[in-house]
Amino acid sequence: MGDMRDHEEVLEIPDRDSEEELENIIGQIAYRDLTIPVTEMQDPEALPTEQTATDYVPSSTSTPHPSSGQVYVELQELMMDQRNQELQWVEAAHWIGLEENLREDGVWGRPHLSYLTFWSLLELQKVFSKGTFLLGLAETSLAGVANHLLDCFIYEDQIRPQDREELLRALLLKRSHAEDLGNLEGVKPAVLTRSGGASEPLLPHQPSLETQLYCGQAEGGSEGPSTSGTLKIPPDSETTLVLVGRANFLEKPVLGFVRLKEAVPLEDLVLPEPVGFLLVLLGPEAPHVDYTQLGRAAATLMTERVFRITASMAHNREELLRSLESFLDCSLVLPPTDAPSEKALLNLVPVQKELLRRRYLPSPAKPDPNLYNTLDLNGGKGGPGDEDDPLRRTGRIFGGLIRDIRRRYPYYLSDITDALSPQVLAAVIFIYFAALSPAVTFGGLLGEKTRNLMGVSELLISTAVQGILFALLGAQPLLVLGFSGPLLVFEEAFFSFCESNNLEYIVGRAWIGFWLILLVMLVVAFEGSFLVQYISRYTQEIFSFLISLIFIYETFSKLIKIFQDYPLQQTYAPVVMKPKPQGPVPNTALFSLVLMAGTFLLAMTLRKFKNSTYFPGKLRRVIGDFGVPISILIMVLVDSFIKGTYTQKLSVPDGLKVSNSSARGWVIHPLGLYRLFPTWMMFASVLPALLVFILIFLESQITTLIVSKPERKMIKGSGFHLDLLLVVGMGGVAALFGMPWLSATTVRSVTHANALTVMGKASGPGAAAQIQEVKEQRISGLLVSVLVGLSILMEPILSRIPLAVLFGIFLYMGVTSLSGIQLFDRILLLFKPPKYHPDVPFVKRVKTWRMHLFTGIQIICLAVLWVVKSTPASLALPFVLILTVPLRRLILPLIFRELELQCLDGDDAKVTFDEENGLDEYDEVPMPV
């Protein structure tokens, strides 16, 4: 046994203060909770560097720099295998962020947050204060570590010299894992006892402890940790081994804390990653001591980031004790009352976040906190004011457009090569159906609104041509262009205006297209895209709620019209079926109701099915993502099987023909088709052009903002000015050919981005997967547009779709658009007592009556918009909508405090990659479908 006085002679106090090192590390490593700003993080308190003779710190080594990576902690407990009558160390639990415990049947339980008893924390603090610490031990084998540790135990009077041999043999016993045991029915916690006195060895004599180490391990089955731990341990992790055992010949519990000089694979140990720390907890059996819980507390302590960093840099016992006290200060204790509900436990989350926030607040002695402002938790190049901000104005004519081109086009070659991935092909198939379903639905409804002057044929061709050009030239090719609800509302309003003023609707659209091109050139020239920053959630939610109401209203309006055209009668005269009946037809109204309701309910069910527990996750997601086309297909089959009842079908021309060839052709003469277009209207068309531009600007720019969120970790950037020029410019040219203008559709674009996001493996059991990369390329959008264009050849199939089925999809889009709209949630709260209100910021931080006042103002704005939409002045709807922006910016700050507006109007939508808790893309975007 080495003389511990030799260790005492080499002790010296390091020149560098560990407090400074620890502060630097804490400041540089981003805290996992992204809701806590970097500038609000606090370092631990100043740590003393006084040495004690019981701390072993070799002077020849510098304090190792802590790793910011993951840590794997394994708890092994001394057990007796009653079947083989042998003692062995059994892996009882492990931690990779979350805790996994080994059940009695030998199967690993689900990952969960560690919950500790209050006693175990107090007892841990007690044994830590009297423990033995070896910091910076240069050993590469378990036998060497055990010898050093036992020598220190004897030197500090933790154990008697005659106990050394017994404990050494115990520490070097065979290790077993879950797959070695099958189940734990015959494995029980063991207690080391002396059967024949203090001098009689507990274990049989072995010729050499080092050479006979783990002599029976090869017979115990496969080596290594449990399969669960191995598969999910992040690379470059560091292992902490915690050993817990009971020994009745010991007089008191003893703790040994060992930090190796370098994390290395210990000889004689089969662990997945190099070992950096080793904790040994041994003691006599006592009624008030549960060594399993004590080991769990120690293992949980080693998984905590700040304590682990402190342990990596500590020079003495006091530094570790200070860090342990800080750990206890941030631990919550539940009193022994009745078990609270899950909802009540949710209130602990903000309390814990506040404790962590205070723990990481910068100390007064630290440098200016603004030094941390440039840190970007998402791996970007800086904050919103950085030079690469696409919305930053240059002050030059077309400066933003030129900067977009210079930023994005150098990646053009990689936009092609990055598409060489099976995930891109899968995304093409998925997005094709996601784009085709609304194109057919809106095309059919557009034909209804415009007497087939524009319909399915024009919309499919417009979507294909504009989509191909945008995929080739756009700055953000992940945007999906398409027709949307707001544009449908405008088309209906403009068609009614032209009808009432005896104007040719399709010619008026051509002049609107001409003015659209001029308007977008002016806006892009003066970098007007920066205005999107002033459009808050307040305006977005009013806009989305209005469109949802219009969708729902139009669905039932169309259904009522069917009941009026084909009323229910008590008796029917015999009828002969014709292609289009002239009078009432049996069951047409009821069957249309069944088709509409069936399509809606089926689509809603399949959407929720994605988050159910049936079938494997991938199959559920496929069924949920293709819910709309599956619903349409099923209801079309139902309609086909019931041949005796007439239903109105979708009107689709054969081939590349316009929907109404008797009224128009493919090229629109700007002076008029059948009569001269008024000169005054040629110039007055600038007003409706401005309104269309507002709609396209709102949808496209907000969609680009959502898709380009830093959380998505896209590296090639976006181009607000270039994309706006392309979308509006192509829409203006399309009007000359009698085709609809399009915008970037929010839900479809977010779905496209999610489909191309490659998620890495989870950092640990139960942890969320992190983004590995996003396939930012042009080929998927290009192929989707080509397939949509080829769908015009599916006329025999499309013409079999009943309009009632499209009404069901229309209703589905209206209802799903309400998801994620805070305004809708607050309207529901008007009818709930305050005690049933959810625990969310806009409820907790804002008084109830003031929250209802804010909701009431939004409802008034919504009512004004609905009145405008229902009058002949409906064409001015976008202009009235844009007035809500100055209302929010200028008037509401006079009524509400800044904190209240942040809670009620803040952008708290989270990026959704894996659908959990019933959330999907609709919950992420407060924009209409």
UniProtKB/Swiss-Prot annotation:
Keywords: Acetylation, Anion exchange, Cell membrane, Glycoprotein, Ion transport, Lipoprotein, Membrane, Palmitate, Phosphoprotein, Transmembrane, Transmembrane helix, Transport. A lipid is attached at C861 (S-palmitoyl cysteine). One of its GO terms (cellular component) is membrane. Functions both as a transporter that mediates electroneutral anion exchange across the cell membrane and as a structural protein. Component of the ankyrin-1 complex of the erythrocyte membrane; required for normal flexibility and stability of the erythrocyte membrane and for normal erythrocyte shape via the interactions of its cytoplasmic domain with cytoskeletal proteins, glycolytic enzymes, and hemoglobin. Functions as a transporter that mediates the 1:1 exchange of inorganic anions across the erythrocyte membrane. Residues 190-199 are annotated as: Interaction with ANK1. Residues 46-67, 366-389 are annotated as: Disordered. The modification N-acetylmethionine is found at M1. The modification Phosphothreonine is found at T374. Belongs to the anion exchanger (TC 2.A.31) family. The modification Phosphoserine is found at S18, S199, S222, S363. This is Band 3 anion transport protein. Residues 58-67 have a biased composition (Low complexity).
